[in-house]
Amino acid sequence: MKIFQAVAITILAIAGTSAQGDAGWRQPFDPLRIVGNIYYVGTRGLSSFLIVTPAGGIVIDSGERESVPFIRANVERLGFRLSDVKILLAGHAHFDHVGGHADLQRLTGAQVIVMDADRDAIATGTDRSALGAAGWQKVRVDRVIKDNDTVTLGGVTLTAHLTPGHTQGCTTWTTDATEDGRRFHVAFVCSVTINDGVHLVGNTRVPAIADDYARTFRLLRDLKPDVFVAEHGSVFGLEEKAKRAVAGGANPFVDPEGYRQFVEKSERAYLTQLRAEQGK
């Protein structure tokens, strides 16, 4: 982002360093089917997902503002129209996942639906999380939801699970998809990493952050999806699985064991940091 290149705002750049990504954030990535009616339409490093229904599309995550042209191109390459997107969702309120929301909303007229705990951040374009990184364009929020609320379009229903920690309103979405006559439970997992410089003990921005993460891992252990994806491709092995998908054979995104390992590894990292901060 240009904002991080300006010497005059070095302090802001330092604050957002852990939220910045590598060059892959702004590199194209071929769109592909994840499972059933669910497609990957993001960049190499920032995930965006398109869920196709008879009544139009649902997009989860808009990446940075610079991601929007890539998302649009990928949607069209799949044979769909961006103007058919009716609902815009998000995993959480950080600039690399909602930075393109305002532009996508203008381009599509889509209804923006957000978790209540991230509503103010998304609407004002201000990072209210423990990270406190760069902001984004203000977004008109059309509907505010709470934990376990559902969003339905064209017979497809997604359930919103509040999984706080990374942000206060971090949302893991679940739905079902059918492929080759089989039904798969799918989870779009919100980020569970702890950004560099964020403390779990004595955090003045988000005092309950340690308890938030603990709640999240309890919930994630119980989800048990067949297919899991996340807000950065590296988290769920996007590139390797995409190569296997192109080669044919069994759908590589059907990976319940990979999900279990992901949750265990992420929780271990959280507990390691928590114990270190507690001096244990």
Predicted feature residues:
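Active-site environment of divalent metal-dependent phosphoester hydrolases
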Residues: S67-V68, A93-G99, R119-I122, Q168-T171, ...
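Divalent metal-coordination and catalytic microenvironments
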Residues: N37, I51, D61, I71, ...
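Active-site HxH/HxHxD metal-binding segment of metal-dependent hydrolases
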Residues: E66-P69, E76-T150, V254, F262
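Bacterial N-terminal signal peptides
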Residues: Q5-A15
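Conserved beta-strand hairpin/beta-sheet module of binuclear metal-dependent hydrolase folds
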Residues: G24-L78, L82, W173-I194, H199
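Accessory terminal helices/loops
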Residues: S18-G24, D180, I194-K280
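Active-site neighborhood of phospho(di)ester-bond hydrolases with catalytic His/Asp-centered motifs
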Residues: I60-S62, V85-A93, V112-M115, L162-G165, ...
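Metallo-beta-lactamase
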Residues: Q20, Q27-F29, R33-V35, D84, ...
